[in-house]
C-alpha cells in the first residue's frame, strides 16, 4: 500500500507561497493565485470572501469558543475537583493542548484557504475523510444544540410574567392544595420537567411532537438562518452583538451577585483549596476535556473561519488571544455562578432552619421568638433529654440543615441553567429583570456557537463547485437549517430531553478526539512540519518556535491518545449505558438502562463520523489503484 505522504498534494506553481515582494511581485498576497483572467482570458475566478478586518475574525472565533460550556460546565468542574485547585490542571492543559491545537487549526485554514474538506484534501487526498468527519460532527451537533436556544427562548418569553411561573407551585385540579408532583419536587423542577419538557417516564415513551416547543425550535432556526444566510457578510455583523452582550450581562450579574446575602459563602467554597484533588487523575482528564471541547477543536469551524483571512494575518496572536479570553471567561463566569450559588444555598439553609424552628415551636408550645438559629442546637438537645418520647415522635420530621451539603450539591448542564439559576432568580428582588437578562445571555451564547457550527457546515458545501453551481449561498443555508429543524423536532417530543442527553453525551467525544489526532499527524508527518513551518513564515513572517513544534509533534498527540483510551475504556468498563429519567411519582430523577435501540443509535452516532476517516482513505486507495491498473492496461 502506498504511503499517504507520497501523495501529499503540492499546489500548482502559481499558488505556491511566496514571501512579500518575491516571485509573486509587490502586493501579491502570499498563497493567493495570480489573476486568473491573465491566465485564462474571459474567465473570472470566484473570489473567496474575506472578513472586513482582523477584529471581525477575532470576535467570531471568541463567539464560537465562548459558549454555554463556560457558564454551566466549568463551574461544575470547579465544584467537583477542589474549587481553585482545578485551575492548576486547567491552565496546564491550556498551555500543552488548547493553545497549540487552536493555532494548528487556524493556521491550516488560513494556509489552505478552504473549508475542512478541501483543506485536508489539499494536504493529502487520503485525508478528505477528516473534513467529512468534521462536517458530520458539526451537523449532528447543530441538530441538538439549537434545542438549548429553544428552551432559552421559552424561558425568556415566560420571564415577563409576574410572578415568574416557576416561583410557585400550581394548584391541583380540585383547588384544595398544590399539585402533588410539584410538592414532591420543587416549583423550578416542576416548571422544567412538566411545563417545559412535559417529560415522559422513560425514553421508550416518546409521545408526540409538542407544538409550543416546536414553535420555539422553528423560531430558533429562523434566527440562525438570518445570521448565516450570506456567509461572512452576515456572520461578521452578528458577532459584534453575540460576543459583547454576554460579557455585559455577566458584569451586571457579578455586581448583583456580590451584593446578595450568602454570596461570600459560595465564593469561599470555590476558592477554598482542596489539595488532595490534584492527585485525582479525573481532575486532569476533565481539565483536558474541558479545554478541548470548549474551544471547538475538530469541528471544522475554526478552519472555516481562518480560511476567510488574509494570508498575512497573524493567526498565532489570534490563537493566543482566543485561548486566553475563553479560559478567562470560564473563570469569570464561575465567580458569578458561585456568588449566585452561595445565595441559593444560604437561602435554602436558612429556610430549612426556619422550618425546624417553626416545627419545634408548635410541637412543644414554645414562646414565639424564644427559639433562634443561634440556640437551636442547644434547645434541641434540651428537648431530646427532657421530653424523649415526644421528641422521638417529632424527630422524623426534623430536617437535617447543612450549608455545606447545600454547597456540595453539584449540578451541571441544563440542571444548572434551568433549575439552579431559576431557583436563585425567583428569590431576587425584581426577579423578572434578572430572568430576562439571564436567558437573553444564554440565547446569545447559544446563537454565537450556532453561527460557528453553521459556518463549519456551510463552508465545505459552498466551496464545492458542484453544489454552488446549482444553488446560491442563501438556498444552501436555508436547506441546511430546514433539514436540521425537521430532525430537531425529535427533541420536542415528551422523550425529547432523553434523546438530547444521548446526543449530547455521545455525538462528539470520541469522534473529535480521533479527528484532532489525525489532524496533528497529518500536519506534522504527512504534510511535513518543516514544510508547514516554511509556509507560516512566508505567510506571516513569523518563525515557528520550539514550543509549537514540540506540542504539535509529540505532546498534544500523546495527550489526545491518552484521552481517547480513557474514554473508550470508560465506555467499555461502564457496561450497560444508563440515563437519568424523571419520576413524577417521587419528584426526582432515577437511573435507567438505555434500551437496545438507543444503544444502536449511540453506535451509529459514533460510527457515522469516525468511520469517515478510514473509509474515505480506503476508497481513495482503491480508486487510485484501479486508475493505475487502467493506465498500465492502456499502455
UniProtKB/Swiss-Prot annotation:
Keyword vocabulary terms for this entry: Cell membrane, Glycoprotein, Membrane, Symport, Transmembrane, Transmembrane helix, Transport
GO molecular function: symporter activity
Tissues showing expression: Detected only in kidney and lung.
Compartment annotation: Apical cell membrane
Membrane-traversing stretches: 57-77, 86-106, 128-148, 209-229, 238-258, 285-305, 320-340, 433-453, 475-495, 509-529, 548-568, 598-618
Glycosylation positions in this chain: 174, 400
Domain of life the protein comes from: Eukaryota
Keyword flag Transmembrane: yes
Cytoplasmic side: 1-56, 107-127, 230-237, 306-319, 454-474, 530-547, 619-635
GO terms under cellular component: apical plasma membrane; brush border membrane; plasma membrane
UniProt KW Transport keyword: yes
Lipid bilayer topology: Multi-pass membrane protein
Extracellular side: 78-85, 149-208, 259-284, 341-432, 496-508, 569-597
Region (Disordered): 1-38
Subunit comment: Interacts with CLTRN.
Family: Belongs to the sodium:neurotransmitter symporter (SNF) (TC 2.A.22) family. SLC6A20 subfamily.
Main function: Does not show transporter activity with a range of tested amino acids including proline, glutamine, glutamic acid, leucine, alanine, histidine, glycine and arginine.
Record-given protein name: Sodium- and chloride-dependent transporter XTRP3B
Species of provenance: Mus musculus
